[in-house]
Amino acid sequence: MAKLNAYFGEYGGQYVPQILVPALKQLEQAFIDAQEDPEFRSEFMTLLQEYAGRPTALTLTRNLTKGTKTKLYLKREDLLHGGAHKTNQVLGQALLAKRMGKHEIIAETGAGQHGVATALACALLGLKCRVYMGAKDVERQSPNVFRMKLMGAEVIPVHSGSATLKDACNEALRDWSGSYEDAHYLLGTAAGPHPFPTIVREFQRMIGEETKNQILAREGRLPDAVIACVGGGSNAIGMFADFIEEESVRLIGVEPAGKGIDTDQHGAPLKHGKTGIFFGMKAPLMQDENGQVEESYSVSAGLDFPSVGPQHAHLNAIGRAEYDNVTDDEALEAFQELARSEGIIPALESSHALAHALRMARENPEKEQLLVVNLSGRGDKDIFTVHAILEEKGVI
């Protein structure tokens, strides 16, 4: 039987209850078989093109970098059906679940984007859907909760722990351990137990593949850097995957610094965590001195995650990718700037990557550089959050 690598360097693995090992083995084999099946690939690509709207545009910003010599392109995953990059890999996994004969889908969601993507894929493909969501996130992402319900999903609020994404992940895994014969756990990021990090990367890698083709067609060369926000890391690994071998291209991941990287209110485990076991994998993790998982924090629900995907941990360890961070305030500023200068309202998650690109442009205004930001989602879901913050600050 063919097998995928379970580890990226020292990170990854499969730290799960014994009861889930057969389910994960079945999933790995089904994925390998599907990848080798031209019919599966063709059905996946057809859905991406005709239902989701791929390829997405690569947009050159006209006004944002005025006064600098930076050319900044945006990879427009915000234009994808469902409003974010999440739709790509959800369609892939839902097709895989059907191929495996599963009738139900279990998912977890933070910002609600993965939940919405899962709900739409289940509606399309005739699968039952239940989504676990931290009770706090249910409150701060009410439009997405209603979208999920409209599409027939059952949304289950999780009140344990910090009532956020990590708690939803735990509950979803618990559910799956009792229902895996009929249900597929559709994990929402490039993290968790093997083979999920690999499956999610492969079902997101068209982001980077399209970007490479588009930038070569437009500019005749590769970008100096590709930049993406990192929570669990699926949009970033989707952008990075096709550029890893291109050593001239810097890969820059941006973690949430929250209220400040020197406070205890951030979500930057890559730079400020310790290696531990969480969510079925070995990875950098925000922990207290007793090894307990610390609460992460970010203004954006989708980055509010105390760990990170194992391939990002490995790319960081070997120095192939670099990871920086951006505060809530910087992300909010970038969110407003893009709206005002280009007429595009980005997700707060994506605004972190955008803020970093703007920092790069403005710190070296005379430097000619070609940058691509993965604009991983649109900001409709965040307008109430941003409105409340700006109102509190007296800006509006």
UniProtKB/Swiss-Prot annotation:
SUPFAM superfamilies: Tryptophan synthase beta subunit-like PLP-dependent enzymes. Belongs to the TrpB family. GO terms for cellular component: cytoplasm. It is an enzyme of class 4 (lyase). Its EC number is 4.2.1.20. Keywords: Amino-acid biosynthesis, Aromatic amino acid biosynthesis, Lyase, Pyridoxal phosphate, Tryptophan biosynthesis. It holds the Pfam family PALP. The modification N6-(pyridoxal phosphate)lysine is found at residue 86. PROSITE patterns: TRP_SYNTHASE_BETA. One of its GO terms (molecular function) is tryptophan synthase activity. The beta subunit is responsible for the synthesis of L-tryptophan from indole and L-serine. HAMAP family: Trp_synth_beta (MF_00133). This is Tryptophan synthase beta chain 1. Tetramer of two alpha and two beta chains. The gene is trpB1. It comes from the Bacteria. NCBIfam families: trpB. It catalyses: (1S,2R)-1-C-(indol-3-yl)glycerol 3-phosphate + L-serine = D-glyceraldehyde 3-phosphate + L-tryptophan + H2O. Pathway: Amino-acid biosynthesis; L-tryptophan biosynthesis; L-tryptophan from chorismate: step 5/5.
